[in-house]
Amino acid sequence: MEGVRVPIACALILLAISSITSASIVEHTFNVQNLTVSRLCKRQVITVVNGSLPGPTIRVKEGDSLVIHVLNHSPHNITIHWHGIFHKLTVWADGPSMITQCPIQPGQRYAYRFNITGQEGTLWWHAHASFLRATVYGALVIRPKSGHSYPFPKPHKEVPILFGEWWNTDVVALEEAAIATGVPPNNSDAYTINGRPGNLYPCSKDRMFSLNVVKGKRYLLRIINAAMNIQLFFKIANHRLTVVAADAVYTAPYVTDVIVIAPGQTIDALLFADQSVDTSYYMAAHPYASAPAVPFPNTTTRGVIHYGGASKTGRSKPVLMPKLPSFFDTLTAYRFYSNLTALVNGPHWVPVPRYVDEEMLVTIGLGLEACADNTTCPKFSASMSNHSFVLPKKLSILEAVFHDVKGIFTADFPDQPPVKFDYTNPNVTQTNPGLLFTQKSTSAKILKFNTTVEVVLQNHALIAAESHPMHLHGFNFHVLAQGFGNYDPSRDRSKLNLVDPQSRNTLAVPVGGWAVIRFTANNPGAWIFHCHIDVHLPFGLGMIFVVKNGPTKSTTLPPPPPDLPKC
């Protein structure tokens, strides 16, 4: 059933029940199925939810609980990840394949059950098994609970803006070929706004997102980068935007004419409709290519904003196009990413923990896989601190943790890189080529409950310096500082913002640079930390944080639900 609300007392099977009397259970059914569509002059079979691209928008209030029945009618294994949801004691619903569950096989089903606590804003959901995320995704909107309001002017309307990528090919086969050959997949054929490429692409004149506005009104744009592998610049001609939230955490208002958004990230921005009604205005997005030497699709998607009350007809109105930054404008990207700050004392604001229990320095980037007999070489690999992550095949990591099953993962992820070197020097492998090769493993870092962890994420340039959007499941983290070059504690500790840093679940670590993040491990379970450039995770750019149970029942992981899929 779709969008049903019932009193929360009727659902005693939920693992956590809100004490707020106005809270509800919001229940949906996701039918995962194949669909034949026409895009870019070609008919293509894709996998979608409920027959649409993007899939349905889930709307809840803070304090609600969600039950999503996923029925897999597709020919592919599937899982759904609820990107950015904390999943306090509901980690069995987090969704990454072989991390918290085995995939839902064709013809099978699974009910994701979780509560929405301490979060407001824009999140999203997507497939977390193979490249199906290219077409299996949608928005997850969390509004304040009844009687509470936004900490900014009430908008006239809320508008989801989801960026995507489109391939004129079978995306599952595309990923399988990339993994087999160790070569990145072909670039996408188009970018999309709400599933529509826009009129700069072939056979797409009438396939453009359109937004009608009323002059003098405010609109809340809920912007989501669901693109697979590309960070994006986004602008609206003749309009400025006020950022009020990032990754479902309120920010101090930040006025800008350009949004920069990495795969996995969300931005809430207010648009004030204050321009001439006799002109229309394109919204447009194109790549921020942090690694100029790496091929990327240098095309542009666009939608259009029309004002009501115009004296001219739609066909005769001029349409203005925004001037987007250069594809390689790292300074504009860095300025946007680093200028966001927290809305101190706003709803659900969490101060920075001042005392750190665990310190880690983690290198991230691409390398090469050592050649085995009868294999194609060289293959690209990716790693965190030279550990190239491999998904288990027999049992999910969370089940192994809960049932204490040995041999599924190793608890040896290091606090420091095994070899220290000049991380951002692109010529370092000329004298030490062995740095290029990574070891395959399924490595985890074990954390005691309530441990405060500080992680320095250090990009390296062994293959190509690149900005990696790093996503942590189950937590938000404070972004204390960012910079370029090699992190130097004697120089860079003074840059830490301990007062009002932004909190995120996905951070684009600067190209050829570093970032310092801090979080408290108060959520028991197995949580993957990985690059959200989708081709990089199967190459190995990930690791696991296993957070142990706390001392009480309310801090102890419950057993798996009876319908948890089997491998």
From Swiss-Prot:
Glycan attachment residues as annotated in the record: 34, 50, 77, 115, 186, 298, 339, 374, 386, 427, 450
One CC-aspect GO term: apoplast
Named cofactor requirement(s): Cu cation
Binding, Cu cation 4: 468, 531, 536
Gene Ontology annotations of biological process type: lignin catabolic process
Tissue-level expression: Predominantly expressed in tissues other than the inflorescence stem.
Binding residues for Cu cation 2: 83, 126, 532
Catalyzed reactions: 4 hydroquinone + O2 = 4 benzosemiquinone + 2 H2O
Location relative to the cell: Secreted, Extracellular space, Apoplast
SUPFAM superfamilies linked: Cupredoxins
Pfam families noted in UniProt: Cu-oxidase (PF00394), Cu-oxidase_2 (PF07731), Cu-oxidase_3 (PF07732)
Free-text cofactor note: Binds 4 Cu cations per monomer.
Binding residues annotated for Cu cation 3, in chain numbering: 128, 473, 530
GO MF annotations, alphabetized: copper ion binding; hydroquinone:oxygen oxidoreductase activity
Keywords of this entry: Apoplast, Copper, Glycoprotein, Lignin degradation, Metal-binding, Oxidoreductase, Repeat, Secreted, Signal
PROSITE patterns: MULTICOPPER_OXIDASE2
Plastocyanin-like domain mapped to chain residues: 31-147, 157-310, 412-551
Gene3D superfamilies, per the entry: Cupredoxins - blue copper proteins (2.60.40.420)
Residue sites binding Cu cation 1 per the record: 81, 471
Signal peptide: 1-23
UniProt EC number: 1.10.3.2
Family classification: Belongs to the multicopper oxidase family.
Protein function: Lignin degradation and detoxification of lignin-derived products.
PANTHER family listed in its UniProt record: LACCASE-7, MULTI-COPPER OXIDASE
Name the record gives this protein: Laccase-7
